[in-house]
Amino acid sequence: MEIPPQEAPPGPGADGEAEEAPVEAPSPGPASPPADGRLKAAAKRVTFPSDEDIVSGAVEPKDPWRHAQNVTVDEIIGAYKQACQKLNCRQIPKLLRQLQEFTDLGHRIDCLDLKGEKLDYKTCEALEEVFKRLQFKVVDLEQTNLDEDGASALFDMIEYYESATHLNISFNKHIGTRGWQAAAHMMRKTSCLQYLDARNTPLLDHSAPFVARALRIRSSLAVLHLESSSLSGRPLMLLATALKMNMTLRELYLADNKLNGLQDSAQLGNLLKFNCSLQILDLRNNHVLDSGLAYICEGLKEQRKGLATLVLWNNQLTHTGMAFLGMTLPHTHSLETLNLGHNPIGNEGVRNLKNGLISNRSVLRLGLASTKLTCEGAVAVAEFIAESPRLLRLDLRENEIKTGGLMALSLALKVNHSLLRLDLDREPKKEAVKSFIETQKALLAEIQNGCKRNFVLVREREEKEQRLQLSASMPEITVTEPQPDDEPREEPAAEAQENGAPGPSPGPDSDSDSDSEGEDRDEADGERAEAPCPTLVPPTDSLGPGDRSPPGCPSSPAEQRISVSSPGWGHKVFVVTRVESPPERAEPPVPPAPPGPVSPPASASPPTSPFPTPTEAASTPDPGPPEPQPPLEPPQVGPPLPNGLKPEFALALSPEPPPGPEAKVGSCGLEHELSCSKNEKELEELLLEASQESGQETL
């Protein structure tokens, strides 16, 4: 039954209010919605505060190490015990003993050892009181029976507080998918984690994508141990694909994963093709087989640099696989350690490997232990030893190598000077002739003595190189007469000429290359290794800077020689000579002099002559008193340059010598104009400085 609106009883306190509401609410539009809709539309209004009030406050991120400032051991132990009581979990006595032994809390502590302790979720949560106050180099969580919850909590703590650089989580078989997910997040976010040991911790199909993504995007890991982690199949495929883009991982250990010779080995071969930063690959105790070795060799062949250590111990390899490896070794440039132990290679396999080893120049360590070798195989190995200039260690233990093989190895060591360690069985092998046993003992001793001899030779060579480097790193500056530049220096040049020295400075080879780093270093090193000489005697067929003085003027009272050895670039000796007057010389002895007037002084005077001839004195103008610009005479034509200038200035010198003394005097002005027009400003300034000083000395 409907009640008319006018008969409805009014509510308490609503006299007039209920009637006024519809009067105030309506808006003036004729097509307006009902009254309830109009009320709701009017209530929705949005306003924004002013720019000054739009940000009400700011919160800085929490410092993870805010609890580690000025902390003491007692505070750490007290906080840990309080957390254990709060979480109702047992305390770890092994942890408490280690905490009491810590002294230097301001730096990373060497190790936190929790190996063998059972860590459930609550126990792991209590460890946060330690991790928030201390950082460690090594955190050992091996065989701690971690479950998914405990592992996730621990890995989150280690990531947040950067608690460790080396983390061992091996032998934890129940960390599960969430545990591996937290571990992957830790690997990706932690910049200090360099080493992760996850041996015997299964990385299954549903967990591998997290780890692969962490290694592909960004990771600071340099060493990763995944032995016995059930990687064969899809996990290895994901891991190898991710590592193709990884440039930080240096060592990868994949032993005991039952890797096969088809899909798994193909993935590893592709990894080696694209990854040049991986240095150690350990594949021991797998099923690579000869077919898998072919894939790996294909990847190695395409590497120009990269893998340095390859361990193929116990992979059922035979002589067929050694043929693949023998063809690959000549193309490898970085492989230094190759371990083929416990594979039935046999004598034929070593023969297949021999030529590749001889052609290779990078292998330093070779492992052939327990490879079914006999004396025949030892002879092939001896041939490689005799030809190898770099081999350092060779392992031939657990092989049937008897007298004949030992004799071949002994003879090879007599011509080899690099092998430092040759591992053989200590006990001699049984022989039909009893006297051969004594022969084996003598040969074993001889082989050992040969290795000791090589060791002594290597040590002596290293000490000699160190002494040479030490002597080369000491700068030497030798001044023939330690006087100021303003004073005349007559004695050094006079003594040099009295002793018959051809000139006080080196020839063009050492002078023109003084500013270059890459030329004539070997020659300079050889000269310096013999004896550090203050001055170098130039060759008779070259002209040195000391021969630039005019023949008409004695060079002894105006020359100053300073020899400086520079150990930085080739250890060369540079000689700077200051001359009294502008240089002038006859033609060099290499091109034959054209026929001219018969006059002994007109020919090129030997550089050893200390005094000028009368004709030379007549043909050369006297410098006289010092003038502002005396270098009006042309510089000498030839490789040497004045005052050790750069070799680029040689382009400004005239290539043809004057035919005689008359032409020499007549062409002085022309040669000077050509040289001054082509030389740079530095040449003019240096010549001006030299002439001014020489003028002061003549006064």
Curated annotation (Swiss-Prot):
Keywords: Leucine-rich repeat, Phosphoprotein, Protein phosphatase inhibitor, Repeat. Residues 1-42, 467-667 are annotated as: Disordered. The lineage of its organism: Eukaryota, Metazoa, Chordata, Craniata, Vertebrata. It comes from Bos taurus. This is Protein phosphatase 1 regulatory subunit 37. The modification Phosphoserine is found at S50, S56, S566. Interacts with PPP1CA. LRR repeats lie at residues 220-240, 248-269, 277-297, 306-326, 334-354. GO terms for molecular function: protein phosphatase inhibitor activity. PROSITE patterns: LRR (PS51450). Residues 510-525 have a biased composition (Acidic residues). Belongs to the PPP1R37 family. Coiled coil: none annotated.
